[in-house]
A protein has these predicted regions:
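Conserved PRPP/pyrophosphate-binding segment of the phosphoribosyltransferase/PRPP-pathway fold
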Residues: 1-105, 115-143
Length: 143
């Protein structure tokens, strides 16, 4: 994934969904985290790049420090849906959210099985969010 594509898609998502995001009362945009090693290899987190552009268009803060990938997971494509979720629940940590942040928008680049969004959403709810809405730029198509 190229960084400029993330900027483009984040901006487009903001233009398309800004009104809905306002209606939902979203208080923070939170990108799905990548493991620090992956970030170093790539130089950036694509979900964070998308989230930054989206946040700019919507005038909502991007908050990337609370949700963290603390453990590297094995290749999830080889796992069953249950294994994926369990691996991700162990790999993701969320700091307690500020008390005034109750409605968040979780952003990722690709929605495959939903396990990543599910694990991150659970962690955000445990950390104090009352509502977690999700936005993904692309999804997997079954053949």
């Amino acid at each position: 994934g190229r960084k400029d594509k993330g900027v483009f898609f984040g901006k487009k998502a903001g233009e398309v969904f800004r009104k809905k995001i306002e209606e939902l009362g979203i208080q923070a945009i939170i990108p799905v985290p990548v493991h620090p090693n992956r970030r170093r290899e790539r130089g950036y987190n694509q979900a964070e790049v998308i989230g930054e552009s989206l946040a700019k268009v919507c005038g909502i803060p991007l908050v990337s420090e609370y949700l963290q990938r603390v453990k590297k997971t094995k290749a999830l494509k080889d796992c069953s849906p249950e294994e994926r979720l369990l691996n991700l629940l162990e790999a993701i940590h969320c700091e307690a959210l500020p008390s005034d942040v109750k409605r968040v928008l979780l952003v990722d680049d690709i929605f495959t099985t939903g396990a990543t969004m599910e694990a991150c959403s659970r962690k955000l709810l445990e950390a104090g969010a009352e509502e977690v809405h999700i936005l993904s730029i692309a999804g997997r198509v079954e053949r």
